[in-house]
UniProtKB/Swiss-Prot annotation:
Keyword presence, rRNA-binding: yes
One Pfam short name: Ribosomal_S15
A biological-process GO annotation: translation
Keyword Amino-acid biosynthesis included in the entry's annotation: no
Species: Pseudomonas fluorescens (strain SBW25)
Assembly behavior: Part of the 30S ribosomal subunit. Forms a bridge to the 50S subunit in the 70S ribosome, contacting the 23S rRNA.
GO molecular function annotations of the record: rRNA binding; structural constituent of ribosome
Membrane spanning residue stretches: none
Similarity comment text for this entry: Belongs to the universal ribosomal protein uS15 family.
Keyword annotations of the record: Ribonucleoprotein, Ribosomal protein, RNA-binding, rRNA-binding
CDD domains linked: Ribosomal_S15p_S13e
Name the UniProt record assigns to this protein: Small ribosomal subunit protein uS15
GO cellular component, one term: cytosolic small ribosomal subunit
Length: 89
């Protein structure tokens, strides 16, 4: 379920703040959201895969922590990001 190089590069290019930016909260949240969405499709076919479900829960928690950080740091960037990603927070 890992991202291939082209997918990751496209997501980074879409959400980066400056050229070469791969570590901003926006990029990290976008990558986590993409992985979470891919895993949700996996669970529709493999409902009993509890090992992967643990990884999914870990990703969701990491994304929530990053979103909480961004919300406290810059509310405008936070609102823009959740609007672009279609998250319901």
């Amino acid at each position: 379920m890992a991202l291939d190089v082209q997918e990751k590069a496209q997501i980074v290019a879409d959400y980066q703040q400056a050229v070469g930016d791969t570590g901003s909260p926006e990029v990290q949240v976008a990558l986590l959201t993409h992985n979470i969405n891919k895993l949700q499709g996996h669970f529709k076919a493999n409902g009993k895969d509890h090992h992967s479900r643990r990884g999914l829960i870990r990703m969701v928690n990491q994304r929530r922590k990053l979103l909480d950080y961004l919300k406290g740091k810059d509310l405008g960037r936070y609102q823009t990001l959740i609007g672009r990603l279609g998250l319901r927070r």
